[in-house]
Swiss-Prot record:
Example of a GO biological process term: L-phenylalanine catabolic process
Coiled-coil parts of chain: none
Signal sequence region: none
GO terms, molecular function: homogentisate 1,2-dioxygenase activity; iron ion binding
InterPro entries: HgmA_C, HgmA_N, Homogentis_dOase, Homogentis_dOase_bac, RmlC-like_jellyroll, RmlC_Cupin_sf
Family: Belongs to the homogentisate dioxygenase family.
Name this polypeptide is given: Homogentisate 1,2-dioxygenase
Source organism: Burkholderia ambifaria (strain ATCC BAA-244 / DSM 16087 / CCUG 44356 / LMG 19182 / AMMD)
Essential cofactor(s): Fe cation
């Protein structure tokens, strides 16, 4: 049996966010009533994968038990990866991380590679903060690839990977089963989980937030109530599926921002059954239940929060993943686009599809922008003039769009690559220079 990534998956998914799942690809493969029997069914090995400390409170404790053909320890020693090394995980001053300018920054899309390039080879770090070694902060990567991973498997020991495809579907095989992910969906691969990516559409491009800190979770809803935003039932986790395949394969590991490779003589997708609450998942952003004002004013963008990584300060997240999906705007006597803003947090934005309602030009699908702590930003001149003159007695639908934001409590530091790349737009600041003075002290 193999996980055939040449065609779409046929198996269904398990529904729910961080549930205690139990799934088996062969009947009776899950031990009954215990985790580590003296002899596991079918001659399998029992292995625990821990995503949190053993002593984490039960409501926050994340782990899974895997029943596999060979333990994860079975591979040759690691050595430095000889392919592209464009990843950064430490965001203090260094050759890879120059001083962070206070300028507003914006980039054109990462170009598709000319040479054959798989998902691992196509990764490049644009920005980040904190430290993978200290397990705090994040790294923001882009990927651009044009071939499937062939007999190569990958995992990150540095953090969980929040993957946002912008172009091209991803068929992702993992130790836990398979995820098929398309633009408008996201996938989260937990720290340490081995996976491989096939590209059924050829070219693929997208964004990744690698979370070094506390695991992503659904936000509390407060006075919104018991439903709304991203609903737990819409998060999908793979059912167990395995392959028993031997050969000359390569295992690539990311540790402290560096890539390492090891020879492995079998496929690590040999998990026949598993149970637990630490597993990959995907979510369709089109299912997000958008909340907004039906009287006046534009609420804070926290109403668009999909997932959060909490910090040690109550109410202050280390990372927020926010989206700006299609939605109705109905507020009267209100400037409806996102307002002008300076933020104590830092904001890295991307665009999956369409146009962002605060920027009429220049911010295109696959592109990105960075507005760091206290850098002024907001709608461009054309957007401001149009929105200031629009008829707000009638509702308006923002349609055919999907923008998102990685917002962090600490400064997002662009890498040397991000500041030197030809995709950096040198004239981004010009979008605000046409904003006119309207002040008239004689006319309130």
């Amino acid at each position: 049996m193999t996980l055939d990534l040449s065609k779409p998956a046929t198996a269904g998914y398990l529904s729910g966010f961080a549930n205690e799942f139990a799934t088996e690809a062969l009947p009776g493969a899950l031990p009954h009533g215990r985790n580590s029997p003296q002899r596991a069914p079918y001659g399998l090995y029992a292995e625990q994968l821990s995503g949190t400390a053993f002593t984490a409170p039960r409501g926050h404790n994340r782990r899974s038990w895997l029943y596999r053909i060979r333990p994860a320890a079975v591979h040759r020693p690691f050595e430095p990866f000889t392919g592209p090394q464009r990843l950064v995980s430490e965001f203090g001053d260094s050759a890879d991380v120059p001083p962070t300018p206070p300028n507003q920054l914006r980039w054109d899309p990462l170009p598709m590679p000319v040479e054959p390039t798989d998902f691992v080879e196509g990764l490049v770090t644009m920005a980040g903060n904190g430290s993978a070694a200290a397990m705090n902060g994040c790294a923001i990567h882009l990927y651009a690839a044009n071939r499937s991973m062939q007999d190569r498997f990958f995992y990150s020991a540095d953090g969980e990977l929040l993957i946002v495809p912008q172009q091209g579907r991803l068929f992702i095989a993992t130790e836990f089963g398979r995820l098929d992910v398309e633009p408008f969906e996201i996938a989260v691969i937990p720290r340490g989980v081995r996976f491989s990516v096939a590209l059924p559409d050829g070219d693929a491009r997208g964004y990744i937030c690698e979370n070094f800190g506390a695991l992503l979770r659904l936000p509390d809803l407060g006075p919104i109530g018991s439903n709304g935003l991203a609903n737990p039932r819409d998060f999908l986790t793979p059912q167990a599926a395995y392959e028993d395949r031997e050969g000359a394969f390569e295992l690539v590991a990311k540790l402290n921002g560096r890539l390492w490779r090891a020879d492995i003589g079998h496929s690590p997708f040999d998990v026949v059954a598993w149970h637990g609450n630490y597993a990959p998942y995907k979510y369709d952003l089109r299912l997000f239940n958008t909340i907004g004002s039906i009287s006046f004013d534009h609420p804070d963008p926290s109403i668009f929060l999909v997932l959060q990584s909490q910090s040690d300060t109550p109410g202050v997240d280390a990372i927020d993943f926010v989206i700006f999906p299609p939605r109705w705007l109905a507020a009267e006597d209100t400037f409806r686009p996102p307002w002008f803003h300076r933020n104590v947090a830092s904001e890295f934005m991307g665009l999956v599809h369409g146009a962002y309602d605060a920027k009429a030009e220049g911010f295109v699908p696959g592109g990105a922008s960075l507005h760091n702590c206290m850098s002024g930003h907001g709608p461009d001149a054309d957007t401001f003039e149009k929105a200031s003159a629009s008829d707000t007695t009638k509702p308006h639908k923002v349609d055919a769009t999907m923008a998102f934001m990685f917002e962090t409590r600490t400064l997002i530091r662009p890498t040397r690559y991000a500041l030197d790349t030809a995709q950096l737009q040198p004239d981004y600041f010009e979008c605000w220079q046409g904003i006119r003075k309207h002040f008239n002290p004689e006319q309130p």
